[in-house]
Amino acid sequence: MDDETSVKLLLLQPTRRREWEIREGEELVAELSLPAMRSGGRGSAAGRELEIRTQGMLRREHVVTDAATGEELARVRGHAVELRGIESAEWKSLGRDQGSGLVGPGGEPWLRAKVKSGAFRTTGQVEIAAGHDPALPSLIAAYLLIRKADEAAAAASATVAAT
């Protein structure tokens, strides 16, 4: 991924509510809203209202659909991310201090994302290689990283409560 031509986005949580904005400068690219005690969520990207559903108990899948039409736009199954009609990629850790990202069939990452979680807010950044639509992939990356941060916080709380 070329740093000069890639699109750099910010993941912002403007309030304590579980709502995030993905911005490129002042332009709003996508929005994400996640419930605290349930999986799934809602969002908007590229002018479409989206719904994120989680399916399965042992092998969890996350499915992104158009809220109005029910059309499936993307599916995350394990580490495999399938963007319908666009491409498939693998969601993986890119190494220490590099965050996580979507890696194409050639082994090159075309999306890189990192989040920081504080006591009340989670923020971060997403970088997408030139030539890729930033809206839906950045929303999926933000969703996966925020859920991962939630799971880590819950595990830490359980460890503290057990001692």
Language-model regions: role of each:
Residues 1-163:
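Intrinsically disordered, low-complexity proline/glycine-rich segments
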